[in-house]
Regions:
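PLP-dependent class I/II
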Residues: 1-239
């Protein structure tokens, strides 16, 4: 993934003999999003190359400004899509997700999963069922989820606008709760250490690959007053 391509994977650069292609949009760590046309290009490439397509859709409901993340299953059935209760329902510690897709792919996944652990505890599964039952007949997200997304959206605007005022070139993400930007330092680690000195934790982009060197990831998982405090510390501590 590269900045000049808006952090979208270029399938034309992927090896033709790939057995599996795994993509994640809305994307961690970049916050990048894609449309149906992009997904169709990826889907068609996988069909042409007999490549299994796996789509990590954990952030599909963490979207803003009218953007709706498309599902790969809107394009075709020969794929598998993974979802998570961690982000949408703030159930991070429960470690529960789900998969939907072509029956043959699901069958293969079940064989692998059955050898990894003994499954999620029943009480967690029941909590997830209750969460899904909160959705309306038309698929509308429950009020609790909409409220959470509004809060994340507001925090996102505060952090992005604050970083811009400090001189950073930051895109307003339409998905996830991550803010991704060029630190203007030679290395991500250099900026990360400077931020630690200010009492602020960020994630260095170098941990995500060579093309992410120099970038850092921040999150909007803290309330707005804390975000503003972090911005003030940056204003006073960075030059």
């Amino acid at each position: 993934l590269r900045a000049e391509k808006d952090w979208l994977l270029d399938v034309d650069e992927c090896p033709k003999g790939a057995k599996m292609l795994y993509i994640n949009y809305p994307n961690n760590p970049t916050g990048a999003t894609c449309d149906k046309d992009y997904l169709k290009k990826v889907y068609d490439w996988c069909q042409e190359n007999d490549t299994i397509l796996c789509v990590d859709d954990a952030y599909c409901e963490m979207t803003y400004d009218g953007y709706q993340a498309p599902s790969i299953l809107e394009i075709g059935e020969d794929a598998i899509e993974f979802g998570s209760f961690s982000k949408t329902f703030n159930m991070t510690g429960f470690r529960l997700g789900y998969a939907v897709g072509h029956p043959d792919l699901i069958a293969g996944l079940k064989k692998c999963k059955g050898q990894v652990d003994s499954g999620a505890p029943i009480f967690i599964q029941k909590a997830a069922i209750k969460a899904l039952e909160m959705y309306g007949e038309n698929g509308e997200a429950p009020e609790a989820v909409r409220k959470n997304m509004k809060e994340y959206s507001d925090r996102r605007e505060v952090l992005v606008n604050g970083l811009r005022e400090l001189g950073f070139d930051v895109k307003m993400p339409k998905g996830t709760f991550y803010i991704w930007f060029d630190s203007k330092c030679k290395t991500s680690l250099e900026f990360t250490e400077r931020m630690l000195d200010l009492g602020i934790v960020v994630t260095p982009g170098s941990g995500f690959g060579e093309s992410a060197e120099g970038y850092v990831r921040m999150t909007v998982t803290q309330p707005i007053p804390r975000i503003k405090e972090a911005l003030q510390r940056m204003k006073e501590g960075l030059n």
